[in-house]
Amino acid sequence: FFCIFLFIYNNFCIIVALVKNTMKNKFLQEMQERGYLNQCTNLDKLSEICNKSSISGYIGFDCTARSLHVGSLLQIMILKLMQKHGHRPIVLLGGGTTLIGDPSGKDSTRKILEQSMINKNIKSIKKVFNKILDTSIKKTAPIFVDNAKWLTKLNYIQFLREIGSHFTINKMLTFDSVKIRLDREQSLSYMEFNYMILQAYDFYQLFKNNNCLLQIGGSDQWGNIVNGTDLIRRMTHKEAFGLTSPLITLASGSKMGKTEKGAIWLNEDQLSPYDYWQFWRNTDDRDVKKFLKFFTEIEPKKIENIYHEEKNINLLKILLANEATRILHGKDAAKKAEQTAKDTFESGGIGSDLPEIKIDSKKIERGISFLDLISENKILSSKSEVRRAIANRGFKINDKIVDDEKKIINSNDFKESKFKLSYGKKKHFLVKII
């Protein structure tokens, strides 16, 4: 009898698990399929709420530079996915918290920026969200908020009494953003130590004023996010939710969004659509499938099918580059970048969308040394590096090797006031007379 009971009970548990799985909300299901989902404070309850109605969720972004780089793109793609499934994203641009600086993952105190510079950065960063997110449908259009609106107006004594009383030093010392710095005997300012409380307060403000039920962030933000859900529970006796995405690890071991040329910026005035396209085109073979799920809108099942059927990894890289560039810069820019690459690499021609180096016509009349051309435009950092590259036959002008370090650039090198400068196999520039 006991064996029969055990058999029935086990099968019942399996059926319940299957039912729960099929009931999972489509937004959260796709989060999992794309690899966006790392941790959640209460996944079942959040799924249940999302099945019943649309929600608002937010992600916070520091405004320490004029542009976000591609390391922030996964978070923006999650906001875009929220819209796809009928939910409303809130973009928190941290005009207040950027005055402090998030210590997470940092070895030292960040450079403190003036409010005027932060405001300029916010204005510049906002352009990217308006390009990637859909602003045309009122129900799911992004809400932009700046936490300076409430953080800069706080009364210190009142804040300590009403908010600070809900946090213990004991618990705050256990969070990685604090613990790692202290374990390494690196200084952590009182200002930075307060960052996690301010982030929790942000969530409370958005919960109270915007009915925001969900905060999303990278896995390094888990402690800060949980602080927010705890504060909301203590202040309102209601439940809010936190969700993290995994930190992106590259097969090469390098950091996402950083290359030998510098950061891969999202703003067009800091990185051309062609260079952006090339970044994705040069993805490590081992990362292509993951990046197709992370950074394109192609359905996950379709990606699996494409990856199974298409054996040419370079065609998959072009697909990735086209889709990622389309999302940020538009369809025309993606097509133009692909055609430029084709003209440059396959046809031996000069692509129209290559990064440009402009030289004054008077310099050409006098003649400019090849060494100066390369070093002044920071293609390589020193003339000694340029000399070594020339000795190794690393430079070409219009596909002809430059083998003389004393070469002088003059009008004979130009065709219709331009020429193609190549360094190695993957770096190409359009040198133009102005």
Predicted regions and their residues:
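Short alpha-helical
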Residues: 151, 223, 286
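Well-ordered secondary-structure scaffolds
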Residues: 223-224, 394
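Conserved nucleotide- and phosphate/pyrophosphate-binding catalytic cores
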Residues: 232-434
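Short runs of predominantly hydrophobic/aromatic residues within well-ordered alpha helices
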Residues: 156, 190-203, 225-228, 273-276, ...
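NTP-dependent nucleotidyl-transfer catalytic core
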Residues: 17-219, 229, 236-241, 254, ...
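Acidic/histidine-rich
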Residues: 212, 219-222, 372, 378-379
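Short, positively charged and aromatic/hydrophobic N-terminal segments
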Residues: 4, 9-15, 20
